[in-house]
From Swiss-Prot:
Taxonomic source organism: Serratia proteamaculans (strain 568)
Cofactor: Mg(2+); Ca(2+)
Protein name per UniProt: Probable lipid kinase YegS-like
GO biological process: phospholipid biosynthetic process
Keyword Ubl conjugation: no
């Protein structure tokens, strides 16, 4: 019987003291799993550890953290040549863990680590923005972006994903639309947008399904935007139910361009990017990721195999 293929865990510094993670790592090592561990301290560390992982010849690179950590590791993997590229594994340790939750990845560290090293590897899409930045889960613009950026760390630590919603309710007085124009294949819209979601994954902001039809292996991004032609009570209802609403506009596109007369901010898996022009395109089958059989972000082709 062959020994398990080696893996490297890149863990966000905030989770380095997690006792459950330490015990899970030790348990796998006791089962002869070669598992290297590296801890990030500042921006760019994850990318450097990805290069080290290639030198070590690991089969799996595990991102231990929230959506931002997964983003950084996935982006560094996408920049590698396909031949010999490690598979992405995920250990959810963030505040909301939106991508992991939508994939049905276990939140218990030992279960997540076992999936990350032994699970089925499937090709998944990534999205690229302005030919320089990536996202694996979602890009959000408008009011929702300001809320996730401004939610205090102490509130996030105490309440988790629901903190975004609570902070949003407290900041409704600052509700302001972004005027912009959005174009894509057979799609054109211009006007004032309160919330813009461009999903490779389904949910953001602590479990809110902003792009409920998105899949990570269909070669498309789901655009969903909420226009400003809306009264506040109806706006809140529109964000949290599936009822038809003429002010909720959606499309499935392989690429789209957004232009604004003023500077806008988009959150790419929680990391801000400012600008007046954004070109966002899907990269089909960009990397491989170890996912559970019941992953709800995979289309029928993959999930039924």
């Amino acid at each position: 019987m062959h020994p398990p293929a080696p893996a490297l865990l890149i863990i966000n510094g905030k989770g380095a003291g997690n006792e459950e993670v330490r015990l899970a790592v030790q348990k796998l090592r006791d089962e002869n799993q070669t598992l290297h561990v590296r801890v990030t301290w500042e921006q760019g560390d994850a990318a450097r550890y990805v290069q080290e992982a290639c030198q070590l010849g690991v089969a799996t690179l595990i991102a231990g953290g929230g959506d931002g950590t997964i983003n950084e590791v996935a982006a560094a993997l996408a920049a590698l040549p396909a031949k010999g590229r490690p598979v992405l594994g995920i250990l959810p340790l963030g505040t909301a863990n939106d991508f992991a939750m939508a994939c049905n990845i276990p939140l218990i560290p030992e279960q997540a680590l076992r999936l990350a090293v032994k699970g089925r590897a499937v090709p998944i899409d990534l999205a690229k923005v302005n030919d320089q930045r990536y996202f694996i889960n979602m890009a959000t613009g408008g009011f929702g972006t300001r809320i996730t950026t401004e939610t205090p760390e102490k509130l996030k630590a105490a309440l988790g994903g629901v903190s975004y919603f609570i902070h949003g309710l407290l900041r409704m007085d600052t509700l302001k639309a972004d005027r912009c124009e959005i174009r894509g294949p057979d799609f054109h819209w211009s006007g004032d947008a309160l919330v813009i979601g461009i999903g490779n994954g389904k949910q953001a902001g602590g479990g809110q399904q902003l792009c409920p039809d998105a899949l990570i292996n269909d070669g498309l991004l789901q655009l969903r935007l909420l226009t400003a032609d809306e009264l506040l009570p109806t706006l809140i209802a529109s964000l949290f139910n599936d009822e038809e609403n003429k002010n909720v506009i959606g499309a499935a596109l392989p690429w789209l361009e957004i232009d604004a007369p003023h500077e806008m901010t988009f959150n790419l898996d929680g990391e801000p990017l400012k600008g007046r022009h954004f070109r966002i395109e899907v990269l089909p089958n960009a990397i491989e990721c170890r996912l559970p059989p019941n992953c709800e972000l995979l289309g029928q082709t993959q999930s039924s195999q």
